[in-house]
Curated annotation (Swiss-Prot):
Keywords: Copper, Electron transport, Magnesium, Membrane, Metal-binding, Mitochondrion, Mitochondrion inner membrane, Respiratory chain, Translocase, Transmembrane, Transmembrane helix, Transport. Cu cation A2 binds at residues 222, 224, 226, 230. The chain crosses the membrane at residues 42-62, 87-107. Mg(2+) binds at residue 224. GO terms for biological process: ATP synthesis coupled electron transport. The gene is COX2. Its cofactor is Cu cation. Its main location: mitochondrion. The lineage of its organism: Eukaryota, Viridiplantae, Streptophyta, Embryophyta, Tracheophyta. It is a multi-pass membrane protein. Residues 1-41, 108-260 are mitochondrial intermembrane. Component of the cytochrome c oxidase (complex IV, CIV), a multisubunit enzyme composed of a catalytic core of 3 subunits and several supernumerary subunits. The complex exists as a monomer or a dimer and forms supercomplexes (SCs) in the inner mitochondrial membrane with ubiquinol-cytochrome c oxidoreductase (cytochrome b-c1 complex, complex III, CIII). This is Cytochrome c oxidase subunit 2. It comes from Arabidopsis thaliana.
């Protein structure tokens, strides 16, 4: 078992932040892929705007230097240029905004009939997960707490401050619904590779839909300052095949059924 765990941690693909990383993590959901594509498209326009503004600035500094123009020109009003610098930025903003609308609405889209519903409950300073679709008894669902693994207990291949004792296991290529809430203060359930960041508010249920397109391990953290140990609330989502997911659920339900 130890050998298998070591092989899993060293061979399985992991999506987590890397030192000196400037770009996005690899996308694992359609939403995250859309965010990356939108970023690249907008960045192209931003480069054009930057070059244009720098050209105007350098040209003004070069041609209107005080040594070349000892007596400055006094221009107090220019209707044409005022119209131009109002219309053109508006058009540019429209070209930037319109492509983002489809992505924005798709992020709020709720799957009518998800295959699995998982409830994530934030605590100071750990997460509780409930798989309400699988009942081990008439009153109890598949529930477990997820704590960060201390640095001294990490195994080979595990990531510092990002590993947990119980991962959120989900099937890949399956529509999921995540219901996020909090038991005490504000938290935020965020996993960058999945394109997910949902606030956990006490007394409120926030809902997000996820479709993980590939198997792997995805790391996130609480993204809302929630107290002293805010930085020690990692989130680990493990996407597996449907067959492996079914085996995991069965193994999780057996001990809970025995306790009941």
């Amino acid at each position: 078992m130890i050998v298998l765990k070591w092989l899993f941690f060293t061979i399985s693909p992991c999506d987590a932040a890397e030192p000196w990383q400037l770009g996005f993590q690899d996308a694992a959901t359609p939403i995250m892929q859309g965010i990356i594509d939108l970023h690249h498209d907008i960045f192209f326009f931003l480069i054009l705007i930057l070059v244009f503004v720098l050209w105007i600035l350098v040209r003004a500094l070069w041609h209107f230097h005080y040594k070349k123009n000892a007596i400055p020109q006094r221009i107090v009003h220019g209707t044409t240029i005022e119209i131009l610098w109002t219309i053109f930025p508006s058009i540019i903003l429209m070209f930037i905004a319109i492509p983002s609308f489809a992505l924005l609405y798709s992020m709020d889209e709720v799957v009518v009939d998800p295959a699995i519903t998982i409830k994530a409950i934030g605590h100071q300073w750990y997460w509780t997960y409930e798989y309400s679709d699988y009942n081990s008894s008439d009153e109890q669902s598949l529930t477990f707490d997820s704590y960060m693994i201390p640095e001294e207990d990490l195994e080979l291949g595990q990531l510092r401050l990002l590993e947990v004792d119980n991962r959120v296991v989900v099937p890949a290529k399956t529509h999921l619904r995540i219901i996020v809430t909090s038991a005490d203060v504000l938290h935020s359930w965020a996993v960058p590779s999945l394109g997910v960041k949902c606030d956990a508010v006490p007394g409120r249920l926030n809902q997000i839909s996820i479709l993980v397109q590939r198997e792997g391990v995805y790391y996130g953290q609480c993204s809302e300052i929630c107290g002293t140990n805010h930085a020690f609330m990692p989130i680990v989502v493990e996407a597996v095949s449907r067959k492996d997911y079914g085996s995991w659920v069965s193994n999780q339900l057996i001990p809970q059924t025995g306790e009941a």
